[in-house]
């Protein structure tokens, strides 16, 4: 299975990721989310600040750049930039509950606008070319709605969909509901989709992550807050440098 480091705003910057890469490297890392609108519209100083969030070192690879926007053309442009910068994948954020992000029609609010969400995936694909596209989302907005939300996203054939096992309304106030990650896997299988499903939410360590994989059938787990105070979180594998077949398949990496 794939064990990934979750994107966390004001946490998973380049310096933080370098420390994690040194002491316990996950199979793949995500950047903090970056505003595709800002990259398109910000004055020079603001754009330079955003570009700092897209800095990385070879030690952090494979690494995925995450963007948020509600405008497909800007997603396409951001994806094209990420490809130019050498990222291994591009992620579209469709789960962030931040009000300022939602007011832009981005983040979690996209779960209420599946047509636009699909257009953003298409736009990211156009900009990315041969680089894999992924989506990070939740099980629903006010209530679980995977049945009507996920199939539409899967039709766009992203390489990976990460499902945070809570609704937007629940934020992180209730325990993650991993039965919905299992349902996401079932929906994927029913559609005979090749998209990988990662689960996310309340995973304490790699043993816990492996249990979640067994319980749900998901292809891997994204861990976030468990890294706090524990840079060795991912250093529990027999060979932390080994790239799994699943990672190779999702991010087009050669097997080592």
Show which residues each predicted segment covers:
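Alpha/beta catalytic cores of nucleotide-metabolism and tRNA/nucleoside-modifying enzymes
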Residues: 1-9, 15, 119-128, 132, ...
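Conserved beta-strand positions in the central sheet of alpha/beta enzyme cores
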Residues: 29-30, 64-66, 91, 162, ...
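Active-site beta-loop-alpha junctions enriched in small/polar residues
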Residues: 8-10, 34-36, 68-70, 95-97, ...
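Glycine-rich, positively charged N-terminal anion/phosphate-binding segment
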Residues: 8-84
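Alpha/beta enzyme core
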Residues: 18-23, 73-90, 94-104, 115-197, ...
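Conserved phosphate-coordination/catalytic loops
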Residues: 69, 111, 115, 175, ...
């Amino acid at each position: 299975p794939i064990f990934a480091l979750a994107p966390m705003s004001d946490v998973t910057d380049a310096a933080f990721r370098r420390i994690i890469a040194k002491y316990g490297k996950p199979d793949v890392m995500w950047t903090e989310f970056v505003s595709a609108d800002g990259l398109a519209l910000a004055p020079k100083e603001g754009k330079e600040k955003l570009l700092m969030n897209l800095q990385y070192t070879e030690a952090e690879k494979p690494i995925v750049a995450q963007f948020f926007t509600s405008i497909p053309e800007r997603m396409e442009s951001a994806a094209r930039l990420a490809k130019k910068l050498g990222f291994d994948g591009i992620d579209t954020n469709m789960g962030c509950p931040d009000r300022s992000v939602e007011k832009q029609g981005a983040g979690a609010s996209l779960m209420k606008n599946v047509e636009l969400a699909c257009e953003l995936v298409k736009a990211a694909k156009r900009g990315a070319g041969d680089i894999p596209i992924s989506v990070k989302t939740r099980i629903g907005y006010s209530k679980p709605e995977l049945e009507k939300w996920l199939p539409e996203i899967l039709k766009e054939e992203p390489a990976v969909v990460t499902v945070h096992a809570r609704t937007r309304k629940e934020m992180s106030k209730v325990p993650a509901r991993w039965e919905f990650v299992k349902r996401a896997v079932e929906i994927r299988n029913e559609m005979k989709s090749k998209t990988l499903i990662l689960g996310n939410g309340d995973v304490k360590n790699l043993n816990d992550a492996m249990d979640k994989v067994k319980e749900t059938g998901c292809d891997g787990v994204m861990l976030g807050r468990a890294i706090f105070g524990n840079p060795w979180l991912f250093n529990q594998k027999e060979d932390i440098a080994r790239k799994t077949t699943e990672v190779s398949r999702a991010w087009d990496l050669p097997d080592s």
